[in-house]
């Protein structure tokens, strides 16, 4: 994970994911009536692989992961060494790839940038933080680039699947915990954070409706304009799904925690994506919610998904005050029919012990 993204997370909850998960007292014996008892759940971890680590270290770590119930890893970078050792330990190894937030791409193609309602490019005026450099999903050139990139990634035999991150528009509404940090009141949509109003999007919307979105009196309330943005991202995802399935490999995505929030905050209509599995980031601290909300979020997501599409509950380890809270979060997720858990943050031996005990 980049230092910029770590800082964004740090600002949101007052502690950095980079610091990992604090050491807590051992978890008390607590009964957990979870679906893992039937042996059908599997659990995941988001990891940025350290290229300098020795193979012996990786062999040991990934065996420990497997023994604790982890069955898959989402790697934020390419590393044949890491992927191979994970697979040797019995784990799936997927490439976690930033999709629409791509400053690296905009350096070469600034004309592909999303444009805000105020007319600003992410290249010259990125919203919120300097690394927020968003592509426009409506541009055919962007779609082709992303498909070619996916094809290149999935052509590698040691990669089992593609995991999409930042597969959305910029946050038109931030999680509640960030409003004070950025001194914003986002009870209404602010034009500087509302995307995309580039010529490609405006012309395409006008062709469908006869209206330029910039001429709309209340663009934040215009249902057809919202749907246009939902479908722009849906189209990108579903094209990438075709590429993945041509390789007979899986495709998944990290998404906002519940369908209603995802659509409202980032134009992300993830229940209409052709994914093999979905990973809602149910980071309860970001939304100033209690641990029990994890169960509510899982239940809502499961209700909206088609039968057979597994939902893995993404848990942000720094949101939990102690191991008992973490065990409760795991229980809430699994009792509401999550297919498993995915950890984000420093996965320590204590975290693995909690997972193993809470699901035994």
PLM regions and their residue ranges:
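Short, acidic/polar
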Residues: 51-65, 142-152, 260-272, 322-332
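N-terminal export signals
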Residues: 7-29
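Active-site-adjacent "subsite" loops/lids of carbohydrate-active enzymes
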Residues: 94-152
């Amino acid at each position: 994970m980049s230092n910029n993204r770590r800082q964004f997370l740090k600002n949101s909850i007052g502690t950095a994911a980079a610091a990992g998960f604090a050491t807590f007292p051992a978890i008390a014996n607590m009964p957990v009536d979870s679906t893992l008892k039937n042996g059908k759940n599997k659990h995941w971890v988001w990891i940025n692989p350290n290229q300098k680590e020795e193979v012996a270290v990786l062999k040991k770590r990934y065996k420990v992961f497997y023994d604790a119930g982890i069955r898959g890893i989402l790697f934020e970078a390419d590393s044949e060494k890491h992927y191979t050792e994970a697979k040797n330990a019995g784990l799936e190894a997927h490439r976690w790839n930033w999709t629409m937030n791509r400053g690296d791409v905009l350096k070469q193609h600034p004309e592909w940038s999303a444009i805000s309602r105020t007319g600003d490019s992410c290249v010259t005026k990125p919203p919120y933080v300097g690394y927020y450099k968003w592509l426009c999903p409506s541009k055919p050139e962007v779609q082709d680039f992303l498909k070619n990139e996916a094809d290149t990634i999935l052509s590698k035999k040691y990669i089992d699947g593609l995991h999409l991150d930042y597969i959305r528009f910029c946050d038109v509404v931030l999680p509640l915990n960030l409003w004070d940090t950025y001194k914003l009141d986002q009870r209404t949509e602010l034009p500087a954070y509302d995307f995309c109003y580039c010529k490609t999007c405006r012309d395409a919307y006008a062709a469908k409706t006869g209206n330029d979105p910039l001429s709309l009196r209340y663009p934040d309330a215009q249902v057809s304009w919202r749907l246009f943005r939902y479908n722009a991202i849906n189209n990108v995802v579903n094209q990438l799904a075709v590429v993945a399935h041509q390789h007979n490999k899986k495709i998944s995505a990290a998404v906002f925690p519940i369908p209603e929030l995802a659509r409202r905050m980032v134009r992300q209509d993830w229940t209409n994506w052709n994914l093999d599995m979905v990973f809602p980031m149910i980071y309860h601290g970001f939304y100033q919610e209690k641990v029990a909300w994890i169960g509510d979020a899982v239940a809502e997501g499961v209700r909206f998904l088609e039968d057979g599409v597994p939902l893995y509950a993404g848990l942000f380890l720094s949101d939990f005050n102690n191991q008992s809270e973490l065990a409760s979060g795991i229980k809430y997720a699994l009792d509401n029919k999550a297919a498993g858990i995915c950890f984000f943050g420093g996965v320590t031996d204590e975290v693995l012990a909690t997972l193993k005990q809470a699901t035994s």
